[in-house]
Amino acid sequence: MTHIESMLASREPYEVYQWARELFDGREYIEAAQALEYLLAEHGDTMGTGAARELLARSYYPSAQPMRAVDSAREILERDPGNAYAVILLVRSLQRAGRTKEAAAAERMALALGVEV
């Protein structure tokens, strides 16, 4: 068990999310991602984890983990195909990773959803 896991084990899921949100707001993106990874590993099948999944994807992007952001954005879109923010994050993460053909396909998906990238 990692330090973060042991620290979070006694907290309620919402407390873990709130703490991750504070870390994100403080630009501690890697730590926020670690807390959210723990939260989703423990409670990912619970209803209402969409905000945590989105914050996780958002945490990966500025922490220079574009492919993890891509994977998270795709997971969000599997659950919620109309999530405009996830489409934008997918496009930008693919661009950042140098995956121009995939980014172009994601841009077409964004246009189909009426999302301006």
Regions found by a protein language model. Give the residues of each.
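Start-of-helix register in tetratricopeptide repeats
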Residues: 14, 48-51, 85
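Canonical positions in the second alpha-helix
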Residues: 39, 75-76, 109-110
